[in-house]
Amino acid sequence: MIDAYVGLGANLGDRMESLRAAVEQLAREPGFLLRGTSPVYETEPVGPPQPRYLNAVVRIGTLLSPRATLRRLLEIEELLGRVRRERWGAREIDLDLLLYGDRIVADGALRIPHPHLHERAFALIPLAELAPDAYHPQMARTAAELLSTLPEEARQQVRLVGKLRRTLPEPDGGPAGGGSPPAPTDPFPKVC
């Protein structure tokens, strides 16, 4: 099974709920095994003026090919209400395939590692938090090493908001991720 890392982003509607819904959908996918989630960060948008984003990264195990993985991510976006308006525009949900094991893929629209991963704090900070040793095969550096090369100004524009919690039961019927089930109240503050 290959470890793949998926960047999550949302800046329209209930952003936290969009991220949670994406994680739950990824956990339900027959071809994916959810292996971890980063904390959630609020970030400035890249591109035209628009609301701030919430971003996170998840690690999934998969036996699907890189192209099939990307196809499923796009289908999940559509299922969750993604409407493609303009490049780098506001979105209800965005799922980006950041890394797929140590593979390098350049096939049409599919580029792995994600071509801007090494320069974007909103992706590198949650990736390095989740998996500091995740390896970028083109840059020959880990996520933590790449993060250390970003300017301090870029890192300061990314603000920790909280944690994503899976609410789906594990196959054995226990709480997701082990331990106690999540508290019944929402621990995340509303972020505008």
Predicted regions and their residues:
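N-terminal beta1-alpha1 ligand-phosphate binding loop
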Residues: 1-42
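Short, low-complexity intrinsically disordered segments enriched in A/P/G/S/L with frequent Arg
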Residues: 179-183
